[in-house]
């Protein structure tokens, strides 16, 4: 097993990780990045990105991630394949295991492991992810201007995205599996008073219809078992995201949903020298540009933290008491 020590270790790739790498490399922190299971993050499944500055004609998600990686490498980032499988933040220096092939200690660690959208698990949904099925209304809603779409979900996020889509699309149909919402009263009221939003309760999505693009959704009333087809050109899944933080449980403070807690106005965590950027610490905005912004912040925070330490002296760090999330 390889054993190395570095000034800055970045765990995860994507807009947050690559931006952190660009800034850390330019600050001569000589960052090493392990890209994880999905190099590039959720954008690797995105065909068109039209809302990231600098791409006036839009760009495909994988191409954008390739551009970011190239920029990070140009400034000296050591980008490596590999998945972090265990962390030891109570040790000094902090230690990270990369599968069974590397043991990395680092003065600073930037966590940019992102979050994973929850999906329905339908084969037709997977097949049409690039053809009209999306987990981000803000990202992709514009493509369905003046069209009819459906959205699956019952919480605040689903209601918020339905309201957003109602301003763009001619009609939005919400498919709610149970007989009521899980959202706040204010969000429910907003949905129910929007004229072009229709809500179908006790409704399950059986299949996404269409060969190359979404042409409709087969739905079933779970009270009567009656199936019917709903004609739409886009289907938005808004049943939540799961932060990729399993390996950090018991090592760093997480909130009740598993997102890494950061000190407001910074990317600092409760562990000195450990920073978090992107969707792994953001369940509100979840945009490529905001992830990139926090990636920048994390590198600047790491640089300033190192400068404040002077010659690094390693002392024992206390683990958080809330080991279960």
Where would I find each of the regions flagged by the language model?
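FAD-site-proximal beta/loop scaffold in flavoenzymes
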Residues: 116, 121, 126-143, 239-286, ...
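Internal hydrophobic alpha-helix adjacent to the cofactor/substrate pocket in enzyme cavities
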Residues: 163, 291-311
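Predominantly flavin-linked oxidoreductase catalytic cores and closely associated redox partners
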Residues: 102-105, 112-194, 199
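FAD-binding core/adjacent interface of flavoenzyme oxidoreductases
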Residues: 1-11, 27, 33, 77-147, ...
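Beta1-alpha1 glycine-rich phosphate/pyrophosphate-binding loop at the start
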Residues: 6-75, 148, 159-185, 200, ...
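A Rossmann-like FAD-binding core segment of flavoenzymes
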Residues: 69-98, 103-104, 166-264, 304-313
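Residue-level detector of alpha-helix initiation sites
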Residues: 14-15, 38, 115-117, 156-157, ...
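Conserved small/polar residues in nucleotide/adenosyl-binding loops
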Residues: 314-321
């Amino acid at each position: 097993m390889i054993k190395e020590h570095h000034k800055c270790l970045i765990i995860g790739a994507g807009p947050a990780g690559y931006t952190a790498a660009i800034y850390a490399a330019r600050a001569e922190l000589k960052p090493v990045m392990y890209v994880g299971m999905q190099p590039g993050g959720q954008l690797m499944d995105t065909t068109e990105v039209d809302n990231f500055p600098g791409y006036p004609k839009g760009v495909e998600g994988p191409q954008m991630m390739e551009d970011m990686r190239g920029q990070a490498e140009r400034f000296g980032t050591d980008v490596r394949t590999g998945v972090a499988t265990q962390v030891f933040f109570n040790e000094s220096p902090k230690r990270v295991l990369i599968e069974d092939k590397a043991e990395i200690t680092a003065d600073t660690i930037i966590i940019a492991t992102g979050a994973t959208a929850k999906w329905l698990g339908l084969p037709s949904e997977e097949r049409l992810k690039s053809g009209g099925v999306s987990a981000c209304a803000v990202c992709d809603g514009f493509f369905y201007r003046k069209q009819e779409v459906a959205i699956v979900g019952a919480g605040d996020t689903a209601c918020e995205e339905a309201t957003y889509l109602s301003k763009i699309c001619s009609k939005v149909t919400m498919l709610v599996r149970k007989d009521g919402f899980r959202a706040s009263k204010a969000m429910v009221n907003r949905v129910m008073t929007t004229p072009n939003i229709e809500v179908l309760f006790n409704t399950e999505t059986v299949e996404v219809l269409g060969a190359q693009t979404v042409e409709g959704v087969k739905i079933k009333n779970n009270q009567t078992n009656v199936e019917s087809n709903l004609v739409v050109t886009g289907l938005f899944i808004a049943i939540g995201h799961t932060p990729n933080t399993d390996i950090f449980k018991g090592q760093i403070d997480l909130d009740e949903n598993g997102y890494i807690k950061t000190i407001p106005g910074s990317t600092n965590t409760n562990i000195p020298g450990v920073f978090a950027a992107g969707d792994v610490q953001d369940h509100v905005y979840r945009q490529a540009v905001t992830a990139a912004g926090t990636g920048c912040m994390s590198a600047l925070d790491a640089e300033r933290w190192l400068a404040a330490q002077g010659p690094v002296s390693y002392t024992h760090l206390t683990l958080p008491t809330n080991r279960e999330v």
